[in-house]
Amino acid sequence: MSGVGVGRLIGVGTGPGDPELLTVKAVKALGQADVLAYFAKAGRSGNGRAVVEGLLKPDLVELPLYYPVTTEIDKDDGAYKTQITDFYNASAEAVAAHLAAGRTVAVLSEGDPLFYGSYMHLHVRLANRFPVEVIPGITAMSGCWSLAGLPLVQGDDVLSVLPGTMAEAELGRRLADTEAAVIMKVGRNLPKIRRALAASGRLDQAVYVERGTMKNAAMTALAEKADDEAPYFSLVLVPGWKDRP
């Protein structure tokens, strides 16, 4: 145990999936932690936990935070918001119990903790109650464009990060109005994303990458990919850099 007194919360970015892309500071934090918390689907340990597998102390206490099953509820439904809010509240209190007992709790977050990371929901609930440190991680999009060897922006280019869940017309408008884009949350939205890219005249530039930097990584021109549902770890890159020096 870290000692008598209030514990410390550490949000640890685990990067895009390759364990060798963990930062030195992240590895040190794992060595200091008394408790390891991570979000996951029921019955699974999650990708973040897999990334740090070989770095954990034998006496480390693990605190998996299992998401409720909400796939049958539309995200715009009030019932979804109620269930997910209750889940994050309960997760924060589970972590707080360890912090109040003086333990250092490291919370894993795939990519970067404060960029589309579930850790954020703990951070906003606990940062005003306990000492907090956030250790940044290499983002998934950075890992993907590095894997693809795809220069994305330069000079005064604007980069837009867009969720594939947004309305098709709005997605197409934003794609037409930016020099470069990263489209996250692909999943079952792939056909819609393809149509929006075609409507904005950007389909021929788009590159699809899944599981970037992981052992089973794959990439292809989006125009050549079938409209199958994409895995969770996938995104679409649309490069800018038209006026190359």
From Swiss-Prot:
Its EC number is 2.1.1.130. It is an enzyme of class 2 (transferase). Coiled coil: none annotated. It comes from the Bacteria. It holds the Pfam family TP_methylase. InterPro entries: 4pyrrol_Mease (IPR000878), 4pyrrol_Methylase_sf (IPR035996), 4pyrrole_Mease_sub1 (IPR014777), 4pyrrole_Mease_sub2 (IPR014776), CobI/CbiL (IPR012382), CobI/CbiL/CobIJ_dom (IPR006364), Uropor_MeTrfase_CS (IPR003043). CDD domains: Precorrin_2_C20_MT. PANTHER family: COBALT-PRECORRIN-2 C(20)-METHYLTRANSFERASE. Belongs to the precorrin methyltransferase family. This is Precorrin-2 C(20)-methyltransferase. It comes from Sinorhizobium sp.
